[in-house]
Curated annotation (Swiss-Prot):
PANTHER family: GALACTURONOSYLTRANSFERASE 4-RELATED (PTHR32116), GALACTURONOSYLTRANSFERASE 7-RELATED (PTHR32116:SF12)
Tissue specificity remark: Expressed in roots, inflorescences, flowers, siliques, leaves and stems.
GO biological process terms, semicolon-separated: cell wall organization; pectin biosynthetic process
Gene name of this polypeptide: GAUT7
The keyword Membrane appears for this protein: yes
Name this polypeptide is given: Probable galacturonosyltransferase 7
Membrane-related topology note: Single-pass type II membrane protein
Species whose genome carries this gene: Arabidopsis thaliana (Mouse-ear cress)
Keywords: Cell wall biogenesis/degradation, Glycoprotein, Glycosyltransferase, Golgi apparatus, Membrane, Signal-anchor, Transferase, Transmembrane, Transmembrane helix
Pathway: Glycan metabolism; pectin biosynthesis
Length: 619
């Protein structure tokens, strides 16, 4: 009996389960029929404000329905762009006052950042200081014209994004889009009034006319960005829209609703403008930091040619370690840039056979660099190419690091900033520079040249300088002083001291070894690495501390900096300078380089090599 009762209960439970399954299936069938109907009837648009126009998505000028629906997506894209820009920027210290430009923004965090075009630099906020002596007041008249007292947008852009804003201002092309702008304005007003008119049952004809005009304008604007793209009879469409808007304004409407819609349009427009600005900055930085295709082709062709040639090893030359000769050191991964530096130096030398050039590069570019100088010898001078990653030095970081550049921006509201450029670039020694005393242990004095310089005078007199016991002979820049760099919070600095620059440096290696400069730098770097500051910020502070009171100031005419970001350098100052330094992002071998300064660089480029034409190298 117990068994039978149990069986009966199990049968009842089974029937109940079947009923539940049947009901579930019926519900699913009903839903599968109702949901498509709901979409067909437009019920899915119920979350929109009443009266909003729904049209096919085509452009950024679509109806509010489309913009609201895509607002979250666009913000997601903007956030992704921000994330990419942050990856390009160096990770700067949270506790210091260094701010990140858009690496304007060295595009990678880490000690061994390289400058293909040039990695973008960390931004250092500074206060105003006296103008650079090499630039006359007249050279800034162009800036004064562009930065009027009421134009804060341009100033804010330059502080935030650095040289991108300088480049944009100089390369901005006027657009003939007066009618396009007029159409946009009318479209915005029509969108603002449409919801109120749509609520009036007696104005169904006006509602239809407004809707048709809005959709027509959206379609035209989705295909046109300037007046030349507009279809014929656009003037009639403008008059028709103007008449519709005038009629809509004649009715009593809720002003709060119109105000709300106009504010929504303003917010969306500002978001869109901000998104496109960030996108433009990202593309600018990508162009700056990425090796041009032609230069990559040249490097690959030279590498292949090197391994196809018979002699793969250079004969050991006694000149490489002869202290009686004049030795130059160039740290670079750019073949053309290194070639221009050497060619321009040799051309202006009184006796080039005494010149020895040591080019330090990485393993990736070593064979191409070597093959280039075999194919293109530099008169009677000697060139040695060294692979820094294969050199055997104890307890040393053997990765190539180029001169570190830092972008300095003045805060808004400064009197100086309203008259001169708000952006400056400082270049200092990198980790690789502190290896030179070990690499060239038999030499007593060398001249270090950055790969973004062009020589215009004989540099032989630099070896006759009495540096008064100093280690580093460099041109000082008083445009920015140490006390103005908010990032320098450690160590005892002379706040009124001018900053020294790399680019042209006369280094007394014997004095360097005697004072243990490399060891001092490593000590400072290690002490400062205990915090959360970035490697770039640490390197800046460590370098300035290391060479404090050890810099011999060269005459300003030895080197002129700023040709990689400043459009308004005095022509006479360029003519008088012994060395032109293209510090900044707009390097002369890039398409973004400043056109007026490119000729000084191009004239020293060896154009006879067939690989240049094969790879379409024409900077």
């Amino acid at each position: 009996m117990k068994g039978g009762g149990g069986g009966g209960g199990g049968g009842g439970g089974g029937k109940r389960r079947w009923k539940v399954l049947v009901i579930g299936v019926l519900v699913l069938v009903i839903l599968s029929m109702l949901v498509p109907l709901a979409f067909l009837l437009g019920l899915h648009n119920g979350f929109h404000s009443p009266g909003f126009v729904t049209v096919q998505p085509a452009s950024s000028f679509e109806s509010f329905t489309r913009i609201n629906a895509t607002k979250h997506t666009q913000r997601d894209v903007s956030e992704r762009v921000d994330e990419v820009l942050q990856k390009i920027n160096p990770v700067l210290p949270k506790k210091s006052d260094i701010n990140v430009g858009s690496r304007d923004v060295n595009a990678t965090s880490g000690t061994d950042s390289k400058k293909r075009g040039l990695p973008v630099s960390p931004t250092v906020v500074a206060n105003p200081s006296p103008a650079n002596k090499t630039k006359s007041e007249a050279s800034y008249t162009g800036v004064q014209r562009k930065i009027v007292s009421g134009d804060e947008t341009w100033r804010t852009c330059e502080v935030k994004y650095g040289s991108y804003c300088l480049w944009r201002e100089e390369n901005k092309e006027p657009m003939k889009d007066a009618k396009v702008k007029q159409m946009k304005d009318q479209l915005f007003v029509a969108r603002a009034y449409y919801p109120s008119i749509a609520k009036m049952p007696s104005q169904s004809k006006l509602t239809r006319d407004m809707k048709q005009n809005i959709q027509e304008f959206e379609r035209i604007l989705s295909e046109s960005s300037q007046d030349a793209d507009l279809p014929p009879q656009v003037d009639k469409k403008l008059q028709k829209m103007e008449a519709v808007i005038a009629k809509a304004k004649s009715f009593p409407v809720d002003c709060n609703n119109v105000d709300k819609k106009l504010r929504q349009i303003l917010d969306l427009t500002e978001d869109e403008a901000s998104f496109h600005m960030k996108q433009s900055v990202f593309l600018y930085q990508l162009a700056v930091q990425t090796m041009p295709k032609s230069l990559h082709c040249l490097s690959m062709r030279l590498t292949v040619e090197h391994f196809k040639s018979d002699s793969l090893e250079d004969p050991i030359s006694e000149k490489f370690s002869d202290p009686s000769l004049l030795h130059f050191v160039i740290i670079s991964d750019n073949i053309l840039a290194s070639s221009v530096v050497i060619n321009s130096t040799v051309v202006h030398a009184r006796d080039s056979k005494n010149f020895v050039f040591h080019v330090l590069t990485d393993e990736q570019n070593y064979f191409a660099m070597k093959q280039w100088f075999i194919r293109n010898p530099c008169k009677q001078s000697t060139v040695q190419v060294l692979n820094i990653e294969k050199l055997e030095l104890d307890d040393s970081d053997m990765k190539l690091s180029l001169s570190a550049e830092f972008r300095v921006s003045f805060p808004s509201g400064d009197l100086l900033a309203s008259q001169q450029n708000r952006t400056h670039y400082l270049s200092l020694f990198s980790q690789s520079h502190y290896l030179l005393p070990k690499l060239f242990d038999k030499l007593e004095k060398v001249v270090i040249l950055d790969d973004d310089v062009v020589v215009q005078r004989d540099l032989s007199p630099l070896w006759d300088l009495d540096m008064e016991g100093k280690v580093n002979g460099a041109v000082k820049s008083c445009t920015v002083r140490l006390g103005q760099l908010r990032s320098l919070k450690r160590g005892n600095f002379d706040t009124n001291a001018c900053l020294w620059m790399s680019g042209l440096n006369v280094v007394d290696l014997a004095r360097w070894r005697a004072l243990g400069v490399s060891e001092t730098y490593q000590k400072y770097y290690k002490e400062m690495s205990s915090g959360d500051e970035s490697s770039e910020a640490i390197a800046l502070q460590a370098s300035l501390l290391t060479f404090q009171d050890q810099v011999y100031a060269l005459d300003d005419k030895w080197a002129l900096s700023g040709l990689g970001y400043d459009y308004y350098i005095n022509a006479q100052a360029i003519k008088n300078a012994a060395i032109l330094h293209y510090n900044g992002n707009m390097k002369p071998w890039l398409e973004l380089g400043i056109p007026n300064y490119k000729n000084y660089w191009r004239r020293h480029l060896s154009r006879e090599d067939r690989f240049l034409s094969d790879c379409n190298v024409n900077p």
